[in-house]
Amino acid sequence: MASQGTKRSYEQMETGGERQNATEIRASVGRMVGGIGRFYIQMCTELKLSDYEGRLIQNSITIERMVLSAFDERRNKYLEEHPSAGKDPKKTGGPIYRRRDGKWMRELILYDKEEIRRIWRQANNGEDATAGLTHLMIWHSNLNDATYQRTRALVRTGMDPRMCSLMQGSTLPRRSGAAGAAVKGVGTMVMELIRMIKRGINDRNFWRGENGRRTRIAYERMCNILKGKFQTAAQRAMMDQVRESRNPGNAEIEDLIFLARSALILRGSVAHKSCLPACVYGLSVASGYDFEREGYSLVGIDPFRLLQNSQVFSLIRPNENPAHKSQLVWMACHSAAFEDLRVSSFIRGARVVPRGQLSTRGVQIASNENMETMDSSTLELRSRYWAIRTRSGGNTNQQRASAGQISVQPTFSVQRNLPFERATIMAAFTGNTEGRTSDMRTEIIRMMENARPEDVSFQGRGVFELSDEKATNPIVPSFDMNNEGSYFFGDNAEEYNN
């Protein structure tokens, strides 16, 4: 991409740093995950969790949610100003699962947010360590992406449920910063913008006054983030039109939906990072590993190696398949919910099946579920190979616009063809090419029509043996060319509800 010089790497976004060299980036990312690990160990001590209980992913998620809630200033302020019955704005908590007499018990815990903040800062050399908090948010977002479908949210904003592969990061909180913006898919950004425009249509004062000025700045910033994800001049020019609109309304919504559809073939660049549950970092820190000294990267071999020798457990409901639960968490750990299943299966070294065939529900257990029948099992999070995470979207032809698939946003930089149903996609583009964006629309449609499903993306890129940490010998897999690999095929997952 032409603007490479001004872009910060993900790790810089992740750690809020200015431009750093590779060693400094590795050290600051290492400091970030090390802090998460130290915090987790301290929380396990506070809660008197056994080693086994501390490795339970459900306990990890509760602890992660507590610290995110403790630092959610906006919500904390809101809760103090709007006291609701039975909710203490100064406390946070959740379910902690303990092993008692061969059974799992649920215990609801409550902590002062102030106390949680103190423990977090203490684990992070006295700093607020926002980067670590964002990292946890992205892990939760990746888990949601693998677990839930967003059909309802898509339909509500007038988008097509088949555009689900554009929805990465759709459950990330607003406060997730630059690192959060980097991992949001095109559809997620479009949805946020459409919601904003709809509010403006329904509420006359939305764009007015002092508040309206701030709203406008946020609107233009979101437009610029989305523009930066597109890789063709015509798509970017259309984003300029949307951004500069005096009074955003239905025309802009139309343009945005058009752009979202076009991203199914002319894919945007969306970052992928392997963000692991806090307990995984905790295990490593506890075993004496010094993340800051050794350095760490979210997009290289490090997360694979970490998962290779961490044992994490999960609660399993009576009719769930532990192997399927493992697949769900593996996909979340590598941000691979929207990756081609052929590629994921090859890297994992075990068949990764579409979500419609999974016998498992989400990882979190609802408060009304019966604990009597709960069992636990080891999550199999190891992989056969490792591969570099991408942020390019996998367009061929010098990484410009070309073939995509109606259901993939590549995670791994691995050579493959991107099969897609051109007929399905192009059917959505009949008719409307008039209006002020007509020439751009025509240009975008032309590029899409010229895209060939047999083109190879990530030419020459391969996977690596886990012993090959310097990535010297790429193994380029060969895939069955016509077998399209969408995770969301025949989907029957639950909807995401906050």
From Swiss-Prot:
Residues 1-21 are annotated as: Disordered. It comes from the Viruses. Changing D375E: In strain: SC35M mouse-adapted. Keywords: Capsid protein, Helical capsid protein, Host nucleus, Host-virus interaction, Ribonucleoprotein, RNA-binding, Viral nucleoprotein, Viral penetration into host nucleus, Virion, Virus entry into host cell. GO terms for biological process: symbiont entry into host cell; viral penetration into host nucleus. Late in virus-infected cells, may be cleaved from a 56-kDa protein to a 53-kDa protein by a cellular caspase. This cleavage might be a marker for the onset of apoptosis in infected cells or have a specific function in virus host interaction. A motif (Bipartite nuclear localization signal) lies at residues 198-216. It is found in: Virion; Host nucleus. GO terms for molecular function: RNA binding; structural molecule activity. One of its GO terms (cellular component) is helical viral capsid. A motif (Unconventional nuclear localization signal) lies at residues 1-18. The keyword RNA-binding applies. Pfam families: Flu_NP. Belongs to the influenza viruses nucleoprotein family. Encapsidates the negative strand viral RNA, protecting it from nucleases. The encapsidated genomic RNA is termed the ribonucleoprotein (RNP) and serves as template for transcription and replication. The RNP needs to be localized in the host nucleus to start an infectious cycle, but is too large to diffuse through the nuclear pore complex. NP comprises at least 2 nuclear localization signals that are responsible for the active RNP import into the nucleus through cellular importin alpha/beta pathway. SC35 was derived from A/Seal/Massachussetts/1/80 (H7N7) by serial passages in chicken embryo cells, thereby acquiring a multibasic cleavage site in its hemagglutinin (HA) and becoming 100% lethal for chickens. SC35 was then passaged 11 times in mouse lung, yielding the mouse-adapted variant SC35M. Homomultimerizes to form the nucleocapsid. May bind host exportin-1/XPO1. Binds to viral genomic RNA. Protein-RNA contacts are mediated by a combination of electrostatic interactions between positively charged residues and the phosphate backbone and planar interactions between aromatic side chains and bases. HAMAP family: INFV_NCAP. This is Nucleoprotein. It comes from Influenza A virus (strain A/Seal/Massachusetts/1/1980 H7N7).
